[in-house]
Amino acid sequence: MARIFTQSLLSTAAVIMIATTSACSSGGGNGIPTPPAPAPAPAPTPTPTPTPTPTPTPTPAPTPAPAPSPTPTPTPTPPASSFDTAEYRATAGAVSANALAAYQRGALGTGIKVGVIDSGIDLQSAEFGSRVDPASTSTAGNATIDDESGHGTAVAFTLAGRRNNTGTHGIAFDATLLIFRTDNPGSCTVSTGDNSGCKHDDRSIATALDLARTNNARVVNVSLGGSPASPVLVQAIDRATRAGIVIVISAGNDGTANPDSFAAIATNAAVSRGLVIIAGSVGTNDVISSFSNNAGTGANFFLSAVGEQVRAPNQENVPFLWSGTSFSAPQISGALALLAQAFPTLTGTQLVEILYSSARDAGAAGIDAVYGRGILDLTRAFAPIGQTSLAGSAVPVSLTSNGVLSSAMGDARQTGLGTVILDSFSRAYTLDLARTIGTARQQPALVGALTGRLRHFSAAVGSTAIAVTIAPGRDQASVERLRLSPGDAEQARTIAATITSRLGSRAAFAFGFSQSAAAMGAQLAGRSDPAFLIAQTPEQALGFASNPMTAMALRRDMGGFGLTLATEQGAVLAPVSNPLLAQRSGWQRLGYDRVAIALDRRFSGLSTVLTATHLREQDSLLGAHFGAGLGAVQAASWFVDAAARLEAGGGWSIGAAYRRGWTFAHTRTGFSGSGLVGSEAFAADIGKNGIFSGHDSFGVRIAQPLRVTSGSGLDLQLPSYFDYSTGAVSRYDSQRLNLAPTGRELDLEMRYAVPFQGGMIQTNLYMRRDPGNVATLADDYGLALRYSLGF
């Protein structure tokens, strides 16, 4: 059974001689696809004839090419930037496929054998040099593999033509070629009659496939077409695919809805095993070529690549512009060679699946009857595909977001956290985890400080007092976090006293919902702080966004001292690292619990309190959340707080508070890592009651919210080397995750309150420097004016 080329011998294909006498050569690559540099003006494309015709003789006949220059001595792989050359940009197939992504990784096809079953190769050409494998041979009885038609040479060049900054180059310009000449002796020289043009017998093709298999070819290119494969060829294809070899077959150039009958072998799963790719042709505009057979019944196995106006030399080393699916096939074969070199452990099935899953979609969405799987795209093929994981583990890693710092860490800068990750095909990539760590989103301070339309209720029944804050909603009232108005400050003492009376003369107990243990402890001790909105004291909050859920406090008087034990459970409101989820909610709730013990003492007008707190965070570190890709960090903290307030007489009050924290953090997944994180916060204020009247009040406070101290961070043991031969991490390196910010938030706030018409007017003016401990943020200013009326 004889086969013919899927180029000029089919109805719509064309070959055009380039009007130049220079020898055709090769060149290097770039990242963003750009139109190739125009080739010298070609002669007009001849109108295709409706029936198969022999290979046309170029008109005018080409001037003999100059003697080829010697093959240059191989040199080390050039820097990535040098691949973006005029030669690369003139190579239409490489540009369309975005091959620069492969070249920049050092993937040139080096060491990969690709079989080319065709009409041989120009043995005098300098375009291939020593990269024609010695096992190359004719399987049809020809005395040599020297090409007589030009088709085989052009296909081989499109696949692996050298790169030398002249003309164009092959897509895998350093691959090794196993050339199998399969044209029947003398058939390529017949130019007239029904038997004109090269003919290829199935037995010759089958023998070539077997030789490709036994000589370790990873890929075999077959730019031929015709009737269905004979049994002898089917068996050879079966043997090749069983060995894991990928076969690329041209779709055919009849412009029909389905691939050529020969290429349809790809749909025979028992024989092809998914390793036969049908190559369709598109132009550089990603539109299917008019001559190309469409995907049709072979859509699942059909991949498109440039097959129009492909510049390549013929058997006499004269450059032509070739069109046909014969020239889209070697683009795909070359792409497979690039992948095989870059990722040596990939199987044939994986190579094919990568090209399919990474193809640019064209036509109807998904797999369609025109473009099949889509258009070859090496930028996407060389990028991680599917779920990425930390090398040496099954721990998932995001390419964009693995953690978000808390406000205590602000703008902590990373010097680089390079590690090795694997994609779903176990391909190794380097990833700088530092680029996947975000900073806490900054919220306007007044949003959280002002409670809106809230109503406060408090009542006492016997020795028990209850305080509730209700926020009216659309359908029902919801009980929110307890917030006592300034007028309720004295009532808070009543609550403490009431509870104390229930447990005896020296003990008091409190239990609450949506209220912090620290606040209830202060109530039991009878302490009330000035009503500042923004500048808070360290003991008023954890230092990061949180939502207390349940808390209990027990206080006992001991001869001038007060001892308070408090417990609390709640949720850290950690920023959502996923940008899509962040748009919906912005926060994720991560559990915490804390236990505090406080010792207080009053000395005339001076009240003091010393508190020790243990905080355990289930999935966070001082409010920061690190996903599995950063070890799923867990933390336990100890805080020591010291606070004092002096009633200086004449209505004057002076207060100060300081917190020091030590957080012990460790990773739980993927790799080992730990660290000690220091933190601190402070506040100082001065105020006076009775400025202009006997009942107004004024105060000023400066405060630093919780901030991680200099030098704090985590030491992570990250995988740094991956050995493909063993499929394992060969080395881990210690790298520092810095958590100390450069910014330092300082809050300055003034307050004034005055009674008016049975209520209270309260004014707060504040300035926040380096909000959220981020040095680059503009200072935050705000003014709040409130009027509250008691009932």
Q: How should these model regions be labeled?
A:
Residues 25-38, 108-109, 182-273, 315-323, ...:
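Substrate-binding/access-modulating region of protease and related hydrolase catalytic domains
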Residues 76-80, 100-134, 142-201, 229, ...:
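Subtilisin-like serine protease catalytic core
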Residues 86-94, 98, 210, 217-221, ...:
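C-terminal subdomain of the subtilisin-like protease fold in secreted/lumenal serine endopeptidases
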Residues 118, 126, 265-337, 341:
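Extracellular S/T/G-rich loop segment that most often corresponds to the catalytic His/Ser-adjacent loop
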Residues 158-159, 180-183, 218, 307-373:
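Hydrolase catalytic cores
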Residues 528-541, 564, 576-589, 596, ...:
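Outer membrane beta-barrel transmembrane domains
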Residues 25-111, 126-127:
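Protease zymogen maturation seam
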Residues 442-645:
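Outer membrane beta-barrel translocator domains of Type V secretion systems
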